[in-house]
Amino acid sequence: MTETHNDPEELARRVASLSAQNERLAQILVEARSKIVGLQQQIDDLAQPPSTYATFIRSYSDGTADVMVQGRKMRLTSLPAAMVSTARPGQQVRLNEAMAIVETMTYDHTGELVTVKELIGTHRAMVVGRGDDERVVNLAGSLIGRDGPTIRTGDSVLVDLKAGYALEKIDKSEVEELVLEEVPRVAYEDIGGLSRQIDTIKDAVELPFLHPDLYREHGLKAPKGILLYGPPGCGKTLIAKAVAHSLAQTVGQGNNTPTDDTRGYFLNIKGPELLNKYVGETERQIRLIFTRARDKAAQGHPVVVFFDEMESLFRTRGTGLSSDVETTIVPQLLAEIDGVERLDNVIVIGASNREDMIDPAILRPGRLDVKIKIERPDAEAALDIFSKYLTPDLPIHPVDLAEHGGNAQDAVTAMGQRVVEHMYATTPDNQFLEVTYASGDKETLYFKDFSSGAMIQNIVDRAKKAAIKGYLSHGTRGLQVEHLLAACDDEFQENEDLPNTTNPDDWARISGKKGERIVFIRTIVQRKGEGKNPTPAKAIETPHNTGPYL
């Protein structure tokens, strides 16, 4: 009989148990060793001295590089030597305790914001910082493309003044407002009621681009600018956009390129946007506008610089009616228009409803050569404008369609005629104002005397809204002529209290009623169905010698 400890099966179990214990101990030992290595690495990391960062300038074939360290220019060794061969000027590099380059980093994203005043060659620029302090800085590699610098005069850039590098272009909201926008697709055919003015603009603007040889042969220059003046809401801005679009097409035809691919640019400048409390800031922005315009024009693109509300910026100098900031703003615009640098492919268009307040030096021939009055639409022009908004593709009420044999075009044409007849009728219901002139003569003005393209568009929009509400209420779809007539009456009633009776002479200039001075005004609107009396007359006292503030 054998002993238990000599049993082979028992020995095999003990061997297997000891092997498992050995494996567990080996695994624990490996884990302990890795933890010791990790802790040792942490100890080594904590014991390392802090790294220094520098700005890379240039590298050399021997593996050294020039860097700027805290305002000091130094030549250091790179580890490895080939690492700095791919670094670009202005880039950050990391240095070890021995002042050797051990790693290349990205560009710094913080610094001082300055404005580019002038580019010097392909790798430097003159910039203006706080307090008009001028500095010359190098351009980082991120600002230099294949064809040269990717920045231009007027751009805001981030600079590291200690290293002397411009690092990044920053798009400020102020500059974004002045960025050239592409021309909207507004054609002359989209404008109603201004055919005569459009013909005048075509002769003044398009002929020099279509027939430059004839102009040179006759010693004639293209006009530098156009002034569009007239009452509000009559299409001045719309015409300016159409001019830009037409110029782009004309230049495209002259270059034998498809007109759809021809890009024109329209820079819409609203006068109050440029006004700034800091002396010289408005003039700087005007220079920036024309610099951007010249850049695009030099590439063969036509550029329209449109000044809306022109009288707010370029008011007559020396009148004492404002803070007299125009004493320097007006000469700046004149310098840009008449300056040494030619404005080829650039045309200046100004729009104003108070052209009498614009400085005469701007309006003289040779600057704003063409002056076009945008008048209020008469009945024929109003019908043309209605045809732009009342189109056959609109849902028409079955009753109106039936009256014209189901022809949608005839139906909308008849609608336009009905509402125009209603608008331009000289009936007591359409009487608006009674004005008294300085001579004692009186004149009754009707709502038709104050119509505009914007008013006509608003009437159509009101009618469309009424048609939608009618469909939701009664389930009958379509636009009716009654909707248009009711919208016209609502538009008239809303305008009843709008005339400015405090200073009727200024109001008359803005509204387009020029002529003899108005001294007395009263509204005589008859409100239908309300039984209300006309607004009582109100005398107007015009003060004299009130000083420059009234």
Swiss-Prot record:
Pfam families with a match to the protein in the record: AAA, Prot_ATP_ID_OB_C, Prot_ATP_ID_OB_N
Gene3D superfamilies, A to Z: 1.10.8.60, 1.20.5.170, Nucleic acid-binding proteins (2.40.50.140), P-loop containing nucleotide triphosphate hydrolases (3.40.50.300)
Keyword Acetylation part of the UniProt annotation: no
GO terms assigned for molecular function: ATP binding; ATP hydrolysis activity
Residue ranges the record marks as coiled coil: 9-48
GO biological process, one term: modification-dependent protein catabolic process
UniProt keyword annotations, A-Z: ATP-binding, Chaperone, Coiled coil, Nucleotide-binding, Proteasome
Source organism, top-level taxon: Bacteria
UniProt cross-references to InterPro entries, sorted A to Z: AAA+_ATPase (IPR003593), AAA_ATPase_domain (IPR050168), ATPase_AAA_core (IPR003959), ATPase_AAA_CS (IPR003960), NA-bd_OB-fold (IPR012340), P-loop_NTPase (IPR027417), Prot_ATP_ID_OB_2nd (IPR032501), Prot_ATP_ID_OB_N (IPR041626)
Region (Disordered): 528-550
Biochemical pathway: Protein degradation; proteasomal Pup-dependent pathway
UniProt binding sites for ATP: 233-238
One CC-aspect GO term: proteasome complex
Region Docks into pockets in the proteasome alpha-ring, residue ranges: 549-550
Record text about domains: Consists of three main regions, an N-terminal coiled-coil domain that binds to protein Pup and functions as a docking station, an interdomain involved in ARC hexamerization, and a C-terminal ATPase domain of the AAA type.
Subunit structure: Homohexamer. Assembles into a hexameric ring structure that caps the 20S proteasome core. Strongly interacts with the prokaryotic ubiquitin-like protein Pup through a hydrophobic interface; the interacting region of ARC lies in its N-terminal coiled-coil domain. There is one Pup binding site per ARC hexamer ring. Upon ATP-binding, the C-terminus of ARC interacts with the alpha-rings of the proteasome core, possibly by binding to the intersubunit pockets.
Family designation: Belongs to the AAA ATPase family.
Task of the protein: ATPase which is responsible for recognizing, binding, unfolding and translocation of pupylated proteins into the bacterial 20S proteasome core particle. May be essential for opening the gate of the 20S proteasome via an interaction with its C-terminus, thereby allowing substrate entry and access to the site of proteolysis. Thus, the C-termini of the proteasomal ATPase may function like a 'key in a lock' to induce gate opening and therefore regulate proteolysis.
Name the record gives this protein: Proteasome-associated ATPase
Species annotation: Jonesia denitrificans (strain ATCC 14870 / DSM 20603 / BCRC 15368 / CIP 55.134 / JCM 11481 / NBRC 15587 / NCTC 10816 / Prevot 55134)
